[in-house]
């Protein structure tokens, strides 16, 4: 039997340069690369549903076009459309064809970004029931311009899972492009992460009748949180020689002012050893790049290190007067630089963690190799700095042993690959006056493998310092015919408008070969056809503002059936002319409730500039819970972005070449404890100055001032300041975040003295109309006493007053706070039945209702009913509703989840589909909230509380019941099982946890896990 293969022979090649909304096609000969005019191009534009990628929303056949004398033609696209192109032409009397986008979705680079909104909220984290206030500064993006957006926009607060919109409103900006908005959060809003979005519609046109809107967003956290009471910092050397004693300094400071005297635990984290050096390709450009989220603030120092909860601390220390020292003696591992992180943890009176971290690198010798640079293509120039450990002093005249090796792999007869090394060179280098050594290395074609430089030297004590550095690689050609070479090297990586960009093009293509240059910035691009004039060419391009904030140059050629491409990488055009200099100043420390005036100054290029300024003053402790996510305004508007373009070819691609409280008789109780002292927008005058007067809250501590400025012509900038509110002698109240009705608990009252006078203080707590008093001496500037309190049964809040007084007639301070009181737990269904008959003495019947032995009921409510139907309807609305209080706890969620699952189970047999639907819907919400409360080692009472056996057991019981109802799966239970096992090892005598762990059932076998994807 004979088989036949149809081979289509063509000498037509299509190259596409796609940018948002446009695809340019270049038709060439496949062999010679010569442009082909008059090629008829037909195109199909398809738009797919962005959620369901297989569903077609629209399909358009575009009008055919023909290539011009340079072989170029252009197609326009609507937002979201993807293109496929087919070209046909007659050459030498024979038909030739080529196609791009065979799968109908290849030629697409996204949708053009037409506008942005810089969103700022009055604080980054909210409690349920609070009101979110915000600003958004809207700008329309143009070629080198950022002008105010003038149309109405939609502001919405969205939950990620399940996808839902919690609040939404439409607002219109003012002449500065500023919108103001307020979004009250429901009392029953679930804790977790949300997204605050601003949607900016685009104007429709005949060519793009349904443009997609731009959406800017910023994360918002909702938590039932209590702010930390103190800061914790570690300072000291970040470099040390192995075995040398190292002392770090720990410092704790109360947010309200004064030292924090606390116990702390130290952990040595990581200990990663490596002598590898990595070139810094950033070259200091990070501050010039686009920023849509201040990730360093949000995810930096606020993130707790991942330490095994079972791990014991390496050291413990006590901060007295807010200070302590941490002596260490760290060793380098394997004779290599070893990077450690020293983590310090302290806890407040309620067990909430406060962390500090300090990176420390331990070197095997007193010399280090740093700041590697690798330059060039085939001929590489490698330079490394030789410095003294600790001081960073450059070491000139240092002799360094250098070896270059080629690392490659050889395939054995049995098919296994064996690693081999070949020494390429060996030399002795001497560091120059700047402390750098330089090594020249040639990457030899045909000698494939990775090239590595190994450096070593010795310090005065005879200890050896080593480093290794990847220089580059030579790849084995996978093609039988030699691929054309095309290398594009820019003269530099930064330009300013008015400059001329110069690039060197190296190629082995014949003289006269056509080259298509493409210059792209943001969503814009332009092409130019040139010819090869020799193996080395200098290309120039004028740099205009339209090429900002970053552009790239690419070259493409077709030859011998292959397509060669070269890219310059991103070339930055930072718009420093659009950077505003902003200053915000405050006064010296003021008393609580005092009026202060903040002064904001804006200038541009050294000259005063009138600008819109958003000003916020927020208590610094809030940012210890969640960092400020608002990006730098200049980087948000003018930061460099990667140009949106893509080049494709219908032929194969060639391989690439890389004050103080007084002594008055009555105590003044501070009660204005707002976290946000100011949140407003102002405009600086023609002299670039604005003054804002506010009344400060009565909460003590530092308030962060954030000033972000914008001009209508696109300039932007920001600055920070600080306003402190303080007293030389002050009282602190350390209380629980929430109380349960009828509970008995404790609170701490503390005096903080910043005068250094010492002496005895009288601490007083008032609650429920009763007053408790204790005397205590000041030690290290503080004195603390615990007092008992009892939560009322029928109130939604408990007001506490705390005061401190030095001696009989000395300074005094008072504080008034309100603690929410929640109901005494959600209902748990216990049911039973019996019969009352005439033959029963007195017509009585006994029914036993039992709860688990380890349970501790807070209250019992008995419902009697003549029929099961009447019983099921008792208290139905209360069971289906979220609690009226705003505090979310593990025990309440677990109990309510269990109750709603019981109710759903009853509703089925009784034929109440509506009741069952409502109960299951609430159960799903409770389940999501319960899973969100899970910490790294189990469940605590609330979010952020240490995991406890009791709370974890309650959560496990509820999860097992949820699995039985089909609301969760075995994989989720497997994850919590592992946490429960770890917690059970720490609390082996906890019967409630043991029972909850057993209720999870057997663990999953490997074959039970779902397949990836």
Curated annotation (Swiss-Prot):
Recorded superkingdom: Bacteria
MF annotations from Gene Ontology: endopeptidase inhibitor activity
Annotated region (Disordered), positions in chain: 804-844
Signal peptide span: none
Family stated for the protein in its record: Belongs to the protease inhibitor I39 (alpha-2-macroglobulin) family. Bacterial alpha-2-macroglobulin subfamily.
Protein name stated in the entry: Alpha-2-macroglobulin homolog
Protein's organism: Deinococcus radiodurans (strain ATCC 13939 / DSM 20539 / JCM 16871 / CCUG 27074 / LMG 4051 / NBRC 15346 / NCIMB 9279 / VKM B-1422 / R1)
Taxon lineage: Bacteria, Thermotogati, Deinococcota, Deinococci, Deinococcales
């Amino acid at each position: 039997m004979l088989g036949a293969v149809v081979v289509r022979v063509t000498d037509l090649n299509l190259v596409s340069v796609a940018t948002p909304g446009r695809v340019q096609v270049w038709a060439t000969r496949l062999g010679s690369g010569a442009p082909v005019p008059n090629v008829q191009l037909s195109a199909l534009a398809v738009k797919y549903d962005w959620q369901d990628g297989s569903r077609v929303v629209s399909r358009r056949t575009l009008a055919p076009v023909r290539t011009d004398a340079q072989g170029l033609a252009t197609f326009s696209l609507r937002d979201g459309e993807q293109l496929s192109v087919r070209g046909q032409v007659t050459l030498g009397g024979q038909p030739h064809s080529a196609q791009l986008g065979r799968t109908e979705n290849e030629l697409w680079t996204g949708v053009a970004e037409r506008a942005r909104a810089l969103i700022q909220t009055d604080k980054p984290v909210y409690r349920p029931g609070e009101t979110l206030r915000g600003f958004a500064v809207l700008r329309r993006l143009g070629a080198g311009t950022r002008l105010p957006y003038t149309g109405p926009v939609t502001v919405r607060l969205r939950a990620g899972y399940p996808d839902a919109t919690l609040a939404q409103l439409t607002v219109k900006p003012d002449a500065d492009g500023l919108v103001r908005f307020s979004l009250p959060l429901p009392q029953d809003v679930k804790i977790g992460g949300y997204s605050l979005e601003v949607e900016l519609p685009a104007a429709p046109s005949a060519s793009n009748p349904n443009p997609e809107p731009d959406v800017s967003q910023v994360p918002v956290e909702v938590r039932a949180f209590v702010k930390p009471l103190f800061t914790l910092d570690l300072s000291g050397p970040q470099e040390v020689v192995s075995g040398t004693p190292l002392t770090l300094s720990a410092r704790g400071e109360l947010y309200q002012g004064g030292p924090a005297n606390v116990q702390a635990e130290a952990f040595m984290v990581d200990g990663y050893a490596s002598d590898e050096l990595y070139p810094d390709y950033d070259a200091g450009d990070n501050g010039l790049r686009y920023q849509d989220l201040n990730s360093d603030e949000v995810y930096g120092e606020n993130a707790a290190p991942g330490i095994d909860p079972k791990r014991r601390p390496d050291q413990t220390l006590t901060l007295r007067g807010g200070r302590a020292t941490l002596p260490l003696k760290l060793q380098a591992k394997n004779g290599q630089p070893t990077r450690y992180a020293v983590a310090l943890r302290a806890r407040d009176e309620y067990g909430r963690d406060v962390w500090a971290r300090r990176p420390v690198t331990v070197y095997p010798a007193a010399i280090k190799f740093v700041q590697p640079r690798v330059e060039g293509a085939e001929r590489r120039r490698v330079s490394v700095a030789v410095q003294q450990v600790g001081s960073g002093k450059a070491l000139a005249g240092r002799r360094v042993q250098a070896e270059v090796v080629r690392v490659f792999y050889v395939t054995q007869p049995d098919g296994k690959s064996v690693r081999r090394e070949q020494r390429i060179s060996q030399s002795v280098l001497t560091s120059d006056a700047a402390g750098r050594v330089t090594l020249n290395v040639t990457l030899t074609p045909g000698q494939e493998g990775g090239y590595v430089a190994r450096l070593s030297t010795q310090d005065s004590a005879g200890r050896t310092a080593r480093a290794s550095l990847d220089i580059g690689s030579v790849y084995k050609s996978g093609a039988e015919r030699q691929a054309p070479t095309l290398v594009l090297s820019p003269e530099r990586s930064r330009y300013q408008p008015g400059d001329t960009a110069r690039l060197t093009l190296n190629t082995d293509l014949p003289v006269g070969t056509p080259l298509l240059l493409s210059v792209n910035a943001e969503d814009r691009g332009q092409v130019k056809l040139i010819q090869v004039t020799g193996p080395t060419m200098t290309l120039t391009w004028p740099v205009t503002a339209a090429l900002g904030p970053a552009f790239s140059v690419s070259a493409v050629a077709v030859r011998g059936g292959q397509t060669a491409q070269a890219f310059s990488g991103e070339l930055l055009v930072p718009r420093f002319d659009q950077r505003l200099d902003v200053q915000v100043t405050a006064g010296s420390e003021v008393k609580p409730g005092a009026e202060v005036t903040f002064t904001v100054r804006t200038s541009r290029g050294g000259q005063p500039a009138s600008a819109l300024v958003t000003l916020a003053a927020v208590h610094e402790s809030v940012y210890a819970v969640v960092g400020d996510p608002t990006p730098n305004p200049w980087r948000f508007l003018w930061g460099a972005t990667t140009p949106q373009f893509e080049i494709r070819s219908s032929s194969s691609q060639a391989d690439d070449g890389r004050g103080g409280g007084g002594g008055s008789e009555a105590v003044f109780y501070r009660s204005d404890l707002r976290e946000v002292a100011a949140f407003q927008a102002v405009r600086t005058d023609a002299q670039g100055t604005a003054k804002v007067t506010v009344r400060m809250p009565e909460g003590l501590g530092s308030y962060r001032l954030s000033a972000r400025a914008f001009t209508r012509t696109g300039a932007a900038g920001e600055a920070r300041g600080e306003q402190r509110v303080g007293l030389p002698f002050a009282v602190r109240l350390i209380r629980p975040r929430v109380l349960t009705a009828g509970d008995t608990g404790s609170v701490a009252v503390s005096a903080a003295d910043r005068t250094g006078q010492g002496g005895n203080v009288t601490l007083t707590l008032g609650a429920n109309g009763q007053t408790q008093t204790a005397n205590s001496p000041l030690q290290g500037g503080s004195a603390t006493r615990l007092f008992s309190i009892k939560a009322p049964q029928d109130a939604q809040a408990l007001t506490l007053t705390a005061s401190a007084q030095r001696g009989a007639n000395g300074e005094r301070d008072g504080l008034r706070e309100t603690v929410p009181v929640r109901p005494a737990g959600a209902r748990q269904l216990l049911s039973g039945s019996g019969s009352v008959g005439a033959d029963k003495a007195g017509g009585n019947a006994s029914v036993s209702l039992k709860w688990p032995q380890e349970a501790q009921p807070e209250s019992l409510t008995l419902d009697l009913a003549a029929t099961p139907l009447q019983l099921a309807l008792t208290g139905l609305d209360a069971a289906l509703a979220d609690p009226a209080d705003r505090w979310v706890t593990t025990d309440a969620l677990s109990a309510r989840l269990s109750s709603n699952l019981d109710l759903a189970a009853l509703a089925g047999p009784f034929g109440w589909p509506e009741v069952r639907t409502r109960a299951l819907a609430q159960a799903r919400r409770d389940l999501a909230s319960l899973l969100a409360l899970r910490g790294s080692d189990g469940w605590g009472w609330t979010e952020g509380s240490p995991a406890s056996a009791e709370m974890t057991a309650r959560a496990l019981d509820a999860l097992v019941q949820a699995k039985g109802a089909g609301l969760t799966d075995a994989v989720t239970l497997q994850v919590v099982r592992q946490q429960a096992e770890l917690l059970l090892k720490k609390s082996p005598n906890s019967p409630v946890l043991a029972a909850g762990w057993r209720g999870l059932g057997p663990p999953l076998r490997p074959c039970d896990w779902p397949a990836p994807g």
